[in-house]
Amino acid sequence: STQAKTLFPYTTLFRSDSITVIEKNKDKAIIISCGSAISALHKVGIKPDIHVETERTKIVYDFLVNLNDPEYLRDVLFLSTDVIHPDCASLFNRSALAFKLSEPGAALYHNYFPHLNACAALGGVNPLVGNIGVSAPIHLGFKNLYLFGLDNGYKHKGHHHSKLSSYYNNEESAGALGEMMYGDSLWQREGNFGETIISNAMFDTSRWVIEQVLAANEDVSCFNCSDGVKIERAKAFPSADITLSIPVDKSALLGEIGTFCAPIPLSKKNFEPLLDIEFFNIFIDKMVAEWQQDFTSRNEINQLMLRNFGYLAQISATRQQHIAQVMIGSMNYVFTLLSSILYSFEDEEKTLVLMQPAIGLWLEFLEKAKEMYPQALDSVDMIDNEVMNLFRA
């Protein structure tokens, strides 16, 4: 697998000339579709060899079902991480999951079951599906990647994904989806083939993460055929210049990937006692008690946030580090908002009054977290996201 070429269609500006190149070389490379790119490939009758996803929400499953072609998906290899919506794998005959680095599942497995087979924990798979599209094949040993549609931005606001993808099932929906994704994005970045690309924080972070993955894997040759943002360590490469000549034995190669995989001989019962609900509640109760005070200065609030982060650092050094990983995202998010409010006005006394309802929401969240944590192993998103209606023709 180390010498195989990988054609990697992503979700954004997936042009018709790219489709022609992929069609021409589909027997000479492994095609990996990322997220909504599969809808563009489906529309022109090209089947990827591997499909990757990264989000844990039900809309990922609903999007795949919306292709309305179950047989198309059956013999595609599905690759993702342990946080993916569990229904996704039911659409494919073959699926393989790796742990997502820095998520609780990886910590629990590695801390409590070191006697079992070592399992991969993938980093660099966030924030967007294109990130796992780069990280996963590199981890599997692929050395030559060709990126299509990995734009991480756009030249023209009305054109943000392939015209063949489900984003453009109707014009009104395409506009609404574009507004959701980009809004008032004003970041300007250097383009892969020149010009300027408009990006935003999420897409720019995705670009940066890809650059870090490529920097850590200098033996990988990455060719960026996308008419989007420049990616360091990915050579700008017009798709028309791709000249692959050696056919790939896809069955053998995908079979080889299968040899890297094995079921984990554990069930929910093995993990339930490891959650340590008692310790989680002690941790939450301690923070609740500390936040239920009358603050007299900005500094008191700042110091309390730092102290709470200190608790996470201490927990991270123990076998309960999964608890720190459960809470770190929410604490980062809420404390960022609290810090922003804390310095919104010059008058300290008035600011502290404004902080009270914000702190109240934080306390509400902590109480809700205590309710939710015991059900962590059964918590699966079953919400029908109304955004799905925009993808339907």
Where are these regions (language model features)?
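Glycine-rich phosphate/pyrophosphate-binding loops
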Residues: 37-38, 44-56, 140-161
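Single conserved hydrophobic/aromatic residue that forms the stacking wall/gate
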Residues: 2-12
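Acidic/Gly/His-enriched mid-domain segments of enzyme catalytic cores or analogous surface patches
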Residues: 42-140, 291, 295-298, 302-308, ...
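Histidine-anchored nucleotide/phosphate-binding helix
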Residues: 22, 29-43
